[in-house]
Amino acid sequence: MPAQVSHIIAAEEALRLALPELAETWGIGSDWGLAKDCADDRAAAWFRFGAQGPDIFYHNQRTKPSGIHYGALAHRRNYGLAVEAMTAALIEAKAGFDSREAAWLLGFATHAAVDRAIHPFIVHFAGWQSPLIPESARYRSCHPFLERLLDIHILGTLRGLPIGSCNLEGLLPLGGRERCEGSDGGSFDAALGRLLAKGLRAAFPAAAGADFLIERRIQNAIADAKYFIRVTNPSLTSAGSQSLLPWFDDLSGWRSMALIYPEKLPTGLDVANEEGKTWEHPAGDGRSYTASHGQLFDEAIASAAAALILVAEAIAEARIGAGFASAIGNGGLSVADEDGIPVPPRVSKPLPLKEVMEEEFARRIRAEQGLAAGRV
């Protein structure tokens, strides 16, 4: 799945395309000049956080009860049903575009389009570990590392910025649970928990319908996602600040690079397929492409913009039209067949990402040792 920065940029570009007046109202433009201020109380920040979609559940590995299984479910099926139910809830609550709930939901509505467009590309070029193929162990941790390389690529392409200048604490609401109030006066994280619970119960009645802890799981996922985003913030990418990373030391090994942003793309490696080489869909069903990451990103923006228009029109008209959920899409967000049914990956041609990670790890260890020597 694309990482945090890619989802933010795709959502912003989709909003500027679909709802330019709202983008202007929220201060979302082609640069991040407003990102220097604390983001906690701004609609734009919650829109960007919503764009992280159900990925927040994958980060829910510190706080119990966990909702990590909802991340897997939401990536497999019924995303459109979840968005439809939450849109209906906002219509019933008469929540307008000035509410944080609406801002978050609009962001959430963009997530599926971005995953569907780009995730197969990532799987093809990163590979995966199979327990049946021992030599595939080299590909473990390469997937999230490629996600971060593609963040670097798209940030440079569409924002003209180096990754080290990207401070997510200025773009996302990463404060504590009680920093922002919801429309009912309580914690906004709690309000968000109630809204997302309605979406999950509509999409996954068997799993979520009787889950009396679902709102607590969602709040825990939000808290853990905020923590994860803070400690993997691209602004910590430089060798001078890597000592702030809680998992990095000389014993952590090359796999510890999986969640760390290199300062620049590796020389001589076409991570974005800008040369237009043919690659196969990892489903192994004969689909093949020559699209670059940038071209796929443009497709993702267009599809996300269509989703934004659907949700915005429904809220503005206080009515959900026929076919809403299917237009958002209920198929899988990762490797799926042409009908959207999730299938295991079968075909890939991985880039030499392990070697890049090993080189990056060695470089950072040398830099850390140099810093340590300077402190003596």
Model-derived features: where do they sit?
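N-terminal leader/auxiliary helical segments
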Residues: M1-G107, A112-V376
